[in-house]
Regions:
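Conserved active-site and SAM-binding loop architecture
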Residues: 1-165
Length: 165
């Protein structure tokens, strides 16, 4: 059996970083995202990859063509695949629950990579141009600290921290 490096996606959004790593042969252990709509997109993409890997893309086509509902579509997918998408806002208050859920998904296996890009509105050039003083009080400025907590806890071989200026 070929080893597939395993990764965790934080601040996952609709899964752009995940998509690249999945296509490169990595296994997604979990995605943490606060936006419900983005979580549905992540679940759909994870379902697509599972169906592709199991030669069942006809089911994906049925869903895209609205021949089956989202719930019917999800019935084809193992719970562990859909359950890898965790709908949380990453904060000091939610970290214990997130760690508990991620720990369960990681299990005894290694976590090779953590990827993620916290929201950058608070300190991007565009965000700062709206209000220099508001930047200091914006809690999004400090989300990198939570990312660092995941690095300390899981000690991956690699990490990708994406952001913009």
């Amino acid at each position: 059996m070929i080893y597939m490096p395993r990764f965790l996606d934080l601040f996952a959004g609709a899964g752009g970083l995940s998509e690249g790593f999945l296509r490169a042969g990595y296994e997604a252990v979990a995605h943490v995202e606060m936006d419900v709509a983005a979580c549905y997109t992540l679940k759909t993409r994870m379902a697509y990859h599972w169906l592709r890997d199991h030669n069942q893309l006809a089911v994906y086509s049925q869903y895209l063509n609205r021949e089956i509902t989202r719930n019917q579509f999800y019935e084809y997918i193992p719970h562990g695949v859909l359950g890898s998408v965790l709908n949380y806002e990453i904060s000091t208050e939610t970290l214990p629950a997130i760690f508990k859920d991620v720990d369960a998904l990681v299990g005894d296996g290694p976590l090779d990579l953590i990827v993620g890009g916290p929201p950058c509105q608070a300190y991007s050039i565009a965000g700062r141009s709206r209000s220099e003083t508001r930047m200091m009080g914006d809690q999004r400025n400090y989300l990198y600290r939570h990312y660092a907590e995941f690095l300390r806890r899981y000690r991956p071989k690699y990490f990708v921290f994406e952001n913009v200026l």
